[in-house]
């Protein structure tokens, strides 16, 4: 027995792909795909940060970038942070539920804290909740979404002229690569893509990890062409 075809309001045959339920059962297009590391350079990351303005959304965006880049957090870990998970004096960030639900504490350098501080000041004026939240409208104070941040990274990178893939995990790769080049121990880097799993804390104290990262030198930042003196 043939099923009755779906028709639109004009009586024309309707494709199943036009129904909302059709796409709900489909996995995301990039599910299971693995992209090559190809981390962005310092110059590219800074260019993306400079492509934002000083409105609250831009200040928040720069804060998210430094947490992903200079602390090496996954996007899910960054968006799960609460204000109380940060210890600026100690230079530490507490990840309560990391990969495989593991709890860990990571360090973040002084330069990164200086770029997160403006958002921390603005965050105090918003409802209590996740560290990175929506700043306007009826959903003010609610957590940012991973999809929203990924889209903002992609769009802002295009504005900044960055032609490589610019996604949260690329910033995490950049964190690991830069620390390795700085001579920091792989035990400190704590990066799964460098074959560091649950073994990364064996034989090393968390205070040592945090101190090593907190004392990292600031990245070599190129001059901002917008503020360069004109001759």
List each language-model region with its residue ranges.
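Basic, Lys/Arg- and aromatic-enriched nucleic-acid-binding interface segment
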Residues: 42-75, 124-126, 172
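Catalytic-site neighborhood detector that most strongly recognizes the C-terminal catalytic loop/helix
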Residues: 97-100, 190-215
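A short, glycine-centered helix-capping/turn motif at helix boundaries
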Residues: 67-80, 100, 182-184, 191-192
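Short, basic (Lys/Arg/His-rich) helix/loop patches that form interaction surfaces
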Residues: 50-57, 106, 126-127, 150-187, ...
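C-terminal secondary-structure termini that scaffold catalytic or DNA-interacting sites
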Residues: 1-28, 36-39, 137, 214-231
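Conserved tyrosine-mediated DNA breakage-rejoining catalytic core shared by Y-recombinases
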Residues: 1-23, 42, 76, 80-118
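C-terminal catalytic core of Y-nucleophile DNA break-rejoin enzymes
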Residues: 34, 38, 98-118, 129-154
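Short pre-functional
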Residues: 62-74, 92-94, 177-178, 202
């Amino acid at each position: 027995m043939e099923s009755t075809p779906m028709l639109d309001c004009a009586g024309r045959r309707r494709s199943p792909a036009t129904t909302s339920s059709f796409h709900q059962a489909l996995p995301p297009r990039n599910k299971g795909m693995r992209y090559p590391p190809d981390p962005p350079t310092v110059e590219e990351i800074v260019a993306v940060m400079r492509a934002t303005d000083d409105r609250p959304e831009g200040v928040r965006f720069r804060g998210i970038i430094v947490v992903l880049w200079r602390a090496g957090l996954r996007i899910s870990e960054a968006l799960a942070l609460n204000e109380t998970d940060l210890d600026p004096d100690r230079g530490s960030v507490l990840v309560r539920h990391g990969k495989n639900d593991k709890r860990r504490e990571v360090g973040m350098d002084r330069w990164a804290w200086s770029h997160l501080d403006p958002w921390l000041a603005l965050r105090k004026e918003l409802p209590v909740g996740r560290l990175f939240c929506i700043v306007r409208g009826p959903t003010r104070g609610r957590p940012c979404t991973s999809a929203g941040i990924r889209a903002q990274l992609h769009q802002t990178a295009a504005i900044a002229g960055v032609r490589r893939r610019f996604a949260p995990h690329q910033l995490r790769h950049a964190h690991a690569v830069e620390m390795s080049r700085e001579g920091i121990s792989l035990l400190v880097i704590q990066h799964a893509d460098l074959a560091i799993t649950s073994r990364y804390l064996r034989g090393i104290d968390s205070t040592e990890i945090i101190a090593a990262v907190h004392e990292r030198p600031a990245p070599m930042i190129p001059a901002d062409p917008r503020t360069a003196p004109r001759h």
